[in-house]
Amino acid sequence: MAGGAREVLTLQLGHFAGFVGAHWWNQQDAALGRMAEDEESPGELCPDVLYRTGRTLHGQETYTPRLILMDLKGSLNTLKEEGNLYRDRQLEAAVAWQGKLSTHREDAHPKNPNLQGLLSAEGVRSSDGAWRAKLIQNIQNGKENSIKVWSDFLRVHLHPRSICVIHKYHHDGETGRLEAFGQGESVLKEPRYLEELEDRLHFYVEECDYLQGFQLLCDLHDGFSGVGAKTAELLQDEYAGRGVLTWGLLPGPYSLGEPQKNIYRLLNTAFGLVHLTGYSSFVCPLSLGGNLGLRPKPPVNFPSLHYDATLPFHCSAILATALDTVTVPYRLRSSMVTMAHLADVLSFSGKKVVTAEAIIPFPLVRGQSLPDILTQLGEATPWTSLSACGDSAGHRCFAQSVVLRGIDRASHTSKLNPGTPLPSALHACASGEEVLAQYLQQQHPRVLSSSHLLLTPCKVAPPYPHFFSSFSQKGLAMDSTPKGAAVQSIPVFGALRSTSSLHRTLGDLAEELSRLDLRRWASFMDAGVEQDDMEEMLHELHRLAQCYQEGDSLSN
């Protein structure tokens, strides 16, 4: 039992969702280990929201993610489907059969060298009840290219009920791929996989005291968009009234030289968005791409972050960092905000799609205060879009939920001496919360804004990629590259927003799809999609786009 926490069950559907999830759980694990060294945890976030306690066959207490994960055959590499934490090696060694034995050996997957330094007992509390985590080294430059699957860098143990492999499809290879939305829907129409998912849901849900809802990390670009749609439908049918927050994940970049892959991506994304919005509290696309269309725009740019957009290991780390920040409101110990409440704030009047934006890392400089930095950002929209919607500057914001984390209390308000002329109205504020609220009011007057200011930074300890060259261990911006250990934590400014930029994004997607000659892509339709389904999807996509016209607002 979670002891009063408002539990959340996480579902990860797809291989890129596995990449994002691996970084996400590594960050949670690193945050649990903050009591090590000389670091004091502010205790603002409640880990019991995401984790569950358990006990092994030998009585050892465990603390594992409340997680159901679905991926394809060949995606686990050396990770065992049942995990390692609850295995009884004595039982495994016992052989009851007395007859002749024949041995068939299959070459084991070589363990990725990046895993050699990872902790072997993650997810286990020590005898004194404290959490112990071991610092590990950064993955060496050049070796990041060797990371092919998310299990190569996952550093936490999972419960035996977490991993579900869809054996009828292959993760790698030219054939047997889960490529189309219709294929994904069909997976959960098979009793074998549907019953397995239902059993796992019941296992986790029945042990919760107060389940506030589900966070669904789902690949949109391939057949897992169909798996996600059927999963969201199941959650709505079985657990009506609970929040279902869906994060639609899109890797990148895309090549113009792969027409079938691009057309399938476009169709899967559109069908996924439409069906998921029908069964979710809201859907937030997450991508470092510049747009959703067939002609890719350059990946997004972060001024202080150097990443390789061709590496899923890099892209997923950035998206996980944003996700770890924007989900803060329903993971706080002190806040009464639930998933359902957050969705109500953002998704009124049919606006079931929201965007994610972030500054990673927030440019905190030693000696400066929060009013100083926000004033320097000026009136321009400071965030980088993470939803393939392009620059949000000039577009209307209807509602937003904003989180600024990793700012120490001494920097919350102005440090100017009494009598010094104030550079801005922000410098007159008496608290950090007031500074942030005033800044958002200046940025978007008359917009419904929910904001949270946290002391807790975002953990970016290894195996998180080494993105940051001019930052201290605690994420402070510096003029030169510091010597010593890698950056361990960073301040992050993140937002979920309902914005008129979605009118163009969704409308353009519908227009591109309406120009397709579906006769050329009969293989997609043969996977289980009818012409009527296509027409209904286009109609719904246009309807969604209309919800975000400039004239639409909370007041009318």
From Swiss-Prot:
It comes from Mus musculus (Mouse). Keywords: Cytoplasm, Membrane, Mitochondrion, Mitochondrion outer membrane, Phosphoprotein. It is found in: Mitochondrion outer membrane; Cytoplasm. This is Protein misato homolog 1. GO terms for biological process: mitochondrion distribution; mitochondrion organization. The modification Phosphoserine is found at S41. InterPro entries: DML1/Misato (IPR049942), DML1/Misato_tubulin (IPR029209), Misato_II_tubulin-like (IPR019605), Tubulin/FtsZ_GTPase_sf (IPR036525). One of its GO terms (cellular component) is mitochondrial outer membrane. The gene is Msto1.
